[in-house]
A protein has these predicted regions:
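A short, charged/proline- and glycine-enriched loop
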Residues: 1-6, 61-64
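Eukaryotic intrinsically disordered and solvent-exposed regulatory patches
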Residues: 21-25, 53-54, 80-85, 170, ...
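Active-site-proximal specificity loops/subdomain of glycosyltransferases
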Residues: 46-93
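Conserved catalytic core of nucleotide-sugar-dependent glycosyltransferases
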Residues: 72-74, 79-82, 86-87, 94-98, ...
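C-terminal catalytic/acceptor-binding lobe
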Residues: 134, 141-149, 153-154, 159-179, ...
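A conserved hydrophobic helix/loop-capping motif in glycosyltransferases and polysaccharide synthases
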Residues: 5-14, 27, 39-41
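Short, acidic, metal-binding catalytic loop of nucleotide-sugar glycosyltransferases
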Residues: 23-33
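A conserved acidic beta->alpha catalytic loop
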Residues: 17, 30-31, 38-53
Length: 280
């Protein structure tokens, strides 16, 4: 009996979801150990139909726990899908948190377990992943990047920004920040993820990072010369390859700005400062 890996994936009309599932199964050493926990929110029936077809194809190989819900504006927010996915955890041995657009290297399951087993139960392997090319699904970078604090605001105007940086070191592992698109831990991570259910988008990672550290978790990355897992970033999507819905796909520009930069800012500032300093 192989140790089980609970793979939690939220998805929002994402064409890469089924490819991610298939890739994880085909590249794992023991696909029978994988327990996929999926929360699919869809506005297009094709997303549901594609997932149902893949469930029929792979349900006799890996285990699946699936929630499918028709889109409603109240379901928007990264934490909502993640919470539903992680709520189906049932004491599996390991937990892998990813996004629905992820690439896996061969033997990824054994590699991650061997890495994690060198540390205590409150260690999480995380960090910023390199990108992959969706047309043909191949990696476009190696290793795991350090999340480096930068003064300039490159993606969010109202909170500290952390940009990817290659690590030049001989150490086997290095300390890092929590990344929501890649985190691997033991049962301890399954019991407590640190997720803030109020987070809409930008506030998710810094709050989850803080919560985990407050509970005694250590967050590290492997210093490796190969592609372990990769993530599909927005600027690598082209045409139908890697196509996925965004917040602006469902909301007006004004509504999207409210949820991303007013509501979520209040969540962030209220958490870290006790009140929203932007409204003082």
């Amino acid at each position: 009996m192989y140790p089980k890996i609970f793979v939690k994936i939220p998805a929002l009309d994402d064409s890469e979801l089924t490819h991610t599932i298939e890739n994880a199964i085909k590249t794992s050493v023991y696909p029978e150990r994988l327990v996929f926990s999926i929360c699919l929110t869809y506005s297009q029936s094709v997303a549901r139909e594609e997932l149902e077809a893949y469930l029929d194809r792979y349900a006799n190989i890996s285990d699946f726990k699936v929630t499918m819900q028709t889109f409603h504006p109240d379901l928007l927010g990264v934490a909502k899908g993640r919470y539903i996915a992680e709520s189906m955890y049932e004491d599996e041995d390991y937990v892998l948190q990813i996004d629905a657009h992820t690439w896996f290297c061969p033997e990824w399951d054994e590699r991650l377990i061997k890495m994690l087993n060198k540390h205590d139960d409150k260690t999480i392997i995380s960090g910023l992943l390199p990108p992959y090319e969706p047309n043909g699904r191949y990696p476009k970078g190696k290793g795991v990047y350090l999340a480096e604090f930068v003064e300039e605001r490159t993606y969010c105007e109202w909170m500290p920004n952390w940009n990817p940086k290659e690590v030049k070191s001989d150490d086997e592992f290095f300390d890092n920040k929590f990344s929501a698109h890649f985190a691997f831990g033991t049962k301890e991570f399954g019991k407590y993820s640190g997720l803030n259910r109020s987070s809409f988008f930008w506030s998710e990672e810094p709050i989850q990072d803080f919560n985990l550290r407050s509970k005694g978790f250590k967050i590290i990355s492997p210093n490796i010369p190969y592609s372990l897992l990769c993530h599909l970033y927005t600027d690598h999507i082209h045409g139908e390859h890697g196509k996925r819905a965004t917040i602006s796909s469902y909301l007006s520009e004004e509504e999207a700005n409210y949820w991303m930069n007013i509501y979520d800012r209040e969540v962030y500032e209220s958490f870290f400062f006790g009140e929203s300093i932007s409204s003082l």
